[in-house]
Amino acid sequence: YRLTYYTPDYQVAETDILAAFRMTPQPGVPAEECGAAVAAESSTGTWTTVWTDGLTQLDRYKGRCYDLEPVPGESNRYIAYIAYPIDLFEEGSVTNLLTSIVGNVFGFKALRALRLEDLRIPPDYAKTFWGPPHGIQAERDRLNKYGRPLLGCTVKPKLGLSAKNYGRAVYECLRGGLDFTKDDENVNSQSVMRWRDRSXFCAEAIYKAQAETGEVKGHYLNATAGTVEEMFKRAVFSAQLGVPIIMHDYITGGFTANTSLSMYCRDNGLLLHIHRAMHAVIDRQRNHGIHFRVLAKTLRMSGGDHLHSGTVVGKLEGEREVTLGFVDLMRDPYVEKDRSRGIYFTQDWCGMGGTMPVASGGIHVWHMPALTEIFGDDACLQFGGGTLGHPWGNRPGAAANRVASEACVQARNEGRDLSREGGDVIREACKWSPEL
């Protein structure tokens, strides 16, 4: 492999798709051989020379390991940079992109561990994807909500409620001041609560809350199902009910299903909320798997208006600078290379709409100043137990979150430092809000 696929003198083309792998070779295996093996197996190579190699223009189509960079402070671990010609990939297919780059290389005997840290999607390839159904600005225009983070809540307990009581919980949260409520990721269509019943009661709750508050409200109705046909049946029913947003578990549901659902949402005026269930199986190990920034990039390409991104301050894992790095990759049109934030390549999205990050998991009103400072306005903050755990009930819990959010936004706009004065801001707001 090394003689053909390790090319340190290669000049990267603007159209190349670039990958950065964190690579741990087996003892005694040269890093150059491992990097070349990854490049070969994820492009044109196989374990031996075949006679059809002579019928192929190998220099045009092969992947190339063009740089190896030792990881500081770690022995026998490298960042391998690999360039893939754009012709190796089907246009507009995240499924094909991931199948090619990570589909077959992670089980190599020569590798002790391998992790895909980042991808550079060149403009020529990015333009073949539709991206999010609507994007951040179009969502704000549809909701008529500006200048603050959006607020949500996951209905708990996630399983066990009847459809009618589930709808009642949704209504109380929306009436209290939240913008959205949410199905949990494993709420599909169990015997205790079938999807059609849940959809009908949630739609009733949405319309009642909208009429009483004068605000646009929504509930993430989970369309994820065992078959694509059933998924679309649920999405179509949601569109017929006139609700503004539905939901999909994109990793367990699959990228092909997600892209199809995203296109349906675009054509039918539905926002699409994306949950990342099962992501930690893939991205949590430091030296093996796929970093979440890659999963976030590929979701933006496949299509989703919201994506769960971690909180930095709650119960789920996430380093601040690294989290903010992939949050910017989700919502900004252009992101510069910045290794301190884990961004290995400059990324130009060529006008593709942004995906709104969703902070969810173990957060409550005392986290509101930090969340407002960290994520800014273009984020959705979701408080499950932080709403439903209020001693007075769901509606006061929702009101407390809304008051805390608006107090933090006002304090920030007045120039106050939320990182130092956040606690004082919340305590001052408590004087005017019994719920808080």
UniProtKB/Swiss-Prot annotation:
Modified residue annotations for N6-carboxylysine: 182
Reaction(s) catalysed (UniProt annotation): 2 (2R)-3-phosphoglycerate + 2 H(+) = D-ribulose 1,5-bisphosphate + CO2 + H2O; D-ribulose 1,5-bisphosphate + O2 = 2-phosphoglycolate + (2R)-3-phosphoglycerate + 2 H(+)
Superkingdom, natural source: Eukaryota
The keyword Plastid belongs to this UniProt entry's keyword annotation: yes
CDD domains documented for this protein: RuBisCO_large_I
Enzyme class per UniProt: lyase
Alphabetical list of Pfam families matching this protein: RuBisCO_large (PF00016), RuBisCO_large_N (PF02788)
Enzyme Commission code(s) on record: 4.1.1.39
Subunit-structure text: Heterohexadecamer of 8 large chains and 8 small chains.
Name of the protein described by the UniProt record: Ribulose bisphosphate carboxylase large chain
Gene source species: Euglena stellata
